[in-house]
């Protein structure tokens, strides 16, 4: 069973070492971790640490962590998988990104009403270097399942990053556009709204659409 643990602590050296040591000693396996400094509010300047832990004695972990004097808050949370679910990422030119988002959000709404959890992330971005960096970063995004690239022309460094991303297991949908990106994407779709819809259908556990069945095709 996966359980989330949110901690607010003083920003000091050794905190992560102490916490991960306790989790390991109590038999817990950390499947996801993130930490950042809080920029606003009552805990400004403090560290927010979040773990998703599989197995182990969770209650004992809580009990031991609470003993540290640098711990300000500690609370069990639902995992990101339960709250936000699988993620569709949409990158590219603003106007086309918004059209893809219409399809993706409308389809995700249908599935989420039935108990699934699918979220849609969008970022309008232009320029070869900028888009290439964004594509590269998708592999580091927790729970990202499929990327939709929306634009009029994409190639060069973007194409190379798309190739690498696909090797990591993340599917890539390209709108019909100029450049070499459509040649290396899993599928090319001419209608942006349909692209968003099919992206969500692919990662849904209840829909019957599978990108692997149309890989290499233009729709």
UniProtKB/Swiss-Prot annotation:
Residues 4-79 form the ACT domain. Gene3D superfamilies: 3.30.70.260, Hypothetical protein af1403, domain 2 (3.40.50.10550). SUPFAM superfamilies: ACT-like, CheY-like. PROSITE patterns: ACT. Coiled coil: none annotated. InterPro entries: ACT-like_dom_sf (IPR045865), ACT_dom (IPR002912), AHAS_small-like_ACT (IPR054480), CheY-like_superfamily (IPR011006), DUF5612 (IPR040537), UCP006363_ACT (IPR015832). This is Uncharacterized protein AF_1403. The lineage of its organism: Archaea, Methanobacteriati, Methanobacteriota, Archaeoglobi, Archaeoglobales.
């Amino acid at each position: 069973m996966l359980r989330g643990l949110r901690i607010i602590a003083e920003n000091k050296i050794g905190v992560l070492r102490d916490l991960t040591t306790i989790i390991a000693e109590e038999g817990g396996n950390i499947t996801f971790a993130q930490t950042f400094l809080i920029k606003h509010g009552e805990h400004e300047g403090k560290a927010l640490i979040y773990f998703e832990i599989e197995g182990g004695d969770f209650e004992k972990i809580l009990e031991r962590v609470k003993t540290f004097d640098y711990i300000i808050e500690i609370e069990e949370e639902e995992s990101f998988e339960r709250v936000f679910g699988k993620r569709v990422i949409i990158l590219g030119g603003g106007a086309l990104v918004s059209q893809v988002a219409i399809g993706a959000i409308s389809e995700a709404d249908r599935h989420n009403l039935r108990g699934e959890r699918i979220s849609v992330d969008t970022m309008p971005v232009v320029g070869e270097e900028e888009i290439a960096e964004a594509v590269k970063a998708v592999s580091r995004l927790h729970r990202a399942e499929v990327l939709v690239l929306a634009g009029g022309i994409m190639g060069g460094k973007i194409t190379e990053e798309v190739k690498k991303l696909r090797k990591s297991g993340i599917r890539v949908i390209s709108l019909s556009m100029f450049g070499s990106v459509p040649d290396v994407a899993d599928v090319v779709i001419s209608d942006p709204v349909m692209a968003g819809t099919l992206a969500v259908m692919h990662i849904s556990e209840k829909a019957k659409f599978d990108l692997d069945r149309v890989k290499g095709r233009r729709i």
